Design a protein with these regions (language model features):
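Glycine-rich phosphate-binding loops at beta-strand->alpha-helix junctions
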Residues: 104-124
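Glycine-rich and small/hydrophobic secondary-structure elements
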Residues: 76-85, 129-150
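Flexible, glycine/charged-enriched surface loops at secondary-structure junctions
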Residues: 51-60, 98-108
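Conserved small/polar residues in nucleotide/adenosyl-binding loops
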Residues: 152-154
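Phosphate/ATP-binding catalytic cores across multiple sugar-kinase/actin-like superfamilies
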Residues: 83-105
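Glycine-rich phosphate-binding loop of actin/hexokinase-like ATP-binding domains
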Residues: 1-35, 121-143
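Non-transmembrane, aqueous-exposed alpha-helical and coiled segments at domain scale
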Residues: 8, 16, 100, 104-105, ...
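Gly/charged contiguous loops adjacent to phosphate- or pyrophosphate-bearing nucleotide/cofactor binding elements
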Residues: 38-85
């Protein structure tokens, strides 16, 4: 879901059952926005609730992991969608590097744009492989850079 009031944008898991969340605008939770999805995925991997193959463990496999019990569940299908997004981002980056004839090591800075980039916990994105680990320390959120760049050219 988009980053609207009530979207879970932050999540931290304590133990195996206590997911503490923050929503946009501190409103009642209505779903997960992109940054919330990354946080939940990271926490489930960190606590070995999702294994290295991306399989949600028992007893959560059938119904999903309760992010907000009785209301919002993170399912096996959600995990597959994250895996597909990771694959697309990594493939895109690899093609860009190959076409530019440069390596990860030669990258000095990566600007992560948009509202998603501003709210993204870079360490969690690195931790789940959404972004290559070689970019640690090189990631800079820049917000709505398209709008800013267009204003510069007016």
């Amino acid at each position: 879901m988009p980053g609207v009031p009530g979207a879970v944008c932050r999540a931290v898991l304590f133990g195996k059952n206590n997911m503490v969340t923050k929503t946009i605008g501190n409103k009642p939770a209505i779903g997960l926005c992109g940054t919330g999805i990354i946080d939940v995925m990271y926490e489930l991997v960190r606590h070995h609730i999702v294994d290295t193959q991306g399989i949600l463990g028992e007893p959560w496999f059938e119904k999903g992991f309760p992010v907000v019990p009785g209301k919002i569940y993170f399912t096996q299908e959600d995990i597959r969608q994250v895996q597909m997004a990771k694959a697309a981002i990594c493939a895109g980056l690899e093609v860009l590097l190959q076409k530019s004839n440069i390596s990860h090591e030669q990258i000095k800075k990566v600007y992560v744009a948009g509202g998603f980039g501003m709210g993204l916990d870079m360490e969690k994105a690195l931790g789940i492989g959404l972004l290559p680990i070689g970019l640690r320390g090189k990631l800079t959120p820049v917000g709505n850079s398209a709008l800013e760049l267009s204003l510069i050219h007016i």
